[in-house]
Amino acid sequence: MSRIDLHRWQSAQTAEFGHHQDLRMSAYSIATKTIGNLLGIDYEKDFKDKVIVEVGAGPRGSILYTKGTFKRGIVVEPLIDRWPPEIRKDYEDIGVELIVAPYEDLEIDEQVDETWFFNVVQHVLDPTEQLELAKKTSKVVRVFEGLCQTTDQAHPWTVSEELFTNVFGDFGKIFKGGTVEGFHSADCYYGTWYASDNV
């Protein structure tokens, strides 16, 4: 894969922003709870003293469900300032640092404990580059991503299981779309990769 150009990426962000405008807040709650159950995590208890990076968190990122129990929380969200100010405030109120830039362009000079990709890699400059950066800089990488073979304005990339296995090896499972009411209709790849298992 090679990066899409910046103009194409920006148009994808605009289209994705429009999609989020149509979602009810309850949809984010269902998504976060379902992802947490599938990955076997307790948001409030499992991340104390951890440095967490959530990529493309949207207006109601999963990190909000930690209620600030992390050591350091970072959200990389290029759209954050397009939403009403209270969205930014919700993150800042629990101590989350917000970065308004593409994840691929970050210089991460410390190893973080966790990097999360939940429904984001279809919208980025380069999915492989993002995953490789996370692998290099994170002790744990958590993934829940829709699989798709078509592209559109908001989704410039197709996503297959091989996108993840080519970077991390076979670490995940397939979620069958439509099996949880109010949640993903598409099949998804999910799992947790541990650097300690791959040394």
Predicted regions and their residues:
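Short catalytic micro-motifs in class I SAM-dependent methyltransferases
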Residues: 119-120
